[in-house]
Regions:
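A metal-dependent hydrolase metal-coordination microenvironment
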Residues: 24-174, 178
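Short, intrinsically disordered, charge-balanced linker/junction segments flanking boundaries
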Residues: 181-184
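Conserved oxyanion/phosphate-binding beta-strand-loop segments in alpha/beta enzyme cores
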Residues: 14-22, 29
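Low-complexity, highly charged intrinsically disordered N-terminal segments
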Residues: 1-14
Length: 184
């Protein structure tokens, strides 16, 4: 379910479903904040839906950083599994100019910056939402490249290359988010 392409992943899911018996869905088991390979999780959207249902979740939601590019695959996998799902994304937001300015909220690394989610994006707005966040993904790439330079300054005899070593670990080619975790 983590094959290289969306088409392969969904085809593999169809095969797996022929022999899968899911446990009963538990009404209290809900997770509408599931990251996928489109930000930093090792699970493809297909694998995430499958794993959620195997754990007895009655519903699930995709939330990737700065990207909603995995949403269509998540929806297709959910349809095959017959599981209701939501789609959304997560981004960092500056709290400057608000009552939360200068305060630490839910981001342990930055004062005055909060992680915010957009939930239940209408399916016909996926492209619009993703296009809106394209500049944020570009800013993240610049920040990540600067971090790679700082990491390389600490290394002796080896060097990390963002394009060669980091981007292939992500779904950046499909407008997925590349996070600090890809650098680890």
């Amino acid at each position: 379910l983590n094959a290289p392409t969306r088409e392969e992943r969904l085809a593999n899911l169809k095969e797996v479903l022929k022999t899968t018996n899911f446990p009963p869905a538990v009404p209290q088991y809900i997770n509408n904040h599931i990251h996928t390979t489109y930000s930093f999780s090792p699970y493809s959207p297909t694998a995430a839906v499958y794993a959620a249902r195997m754990e007895g979740l009655c519903t699930a939601g995709i939330i990737d950083h700065d990207s909603i590019s995995g949403a269509r695959e998540f929806l297709e996998a959910a349809e095959l599994i017959q599981m209701p799902v939501t789609i959304g994304m997560e981004c960092r937001a500056s709290m400057d100019g608000t009552a939360m300015e200068g305060k630490r909220t839910n981001n342990p690394d930055q004062v005055g910056v909060s992680y915010m989610t957009i939930q239940s994006v209408p399916h016909d707005k996926i492209d619009e939402v993703n296009a809106f966040f394209a500049p944020y993904r570009e800013a993240r790439h610049r920040r990540n490249r600067a971090m790679v330079e700082k990491i390389n300054a600490l290394l002796d005899g080896i060097a990390l290359d963002y394009d060669r070593d980091v981007l292939p670990l992500s779904e950046a080619k499909e407008n997925g988010g590349v996070t600090e975790r890809h650098l680890m």
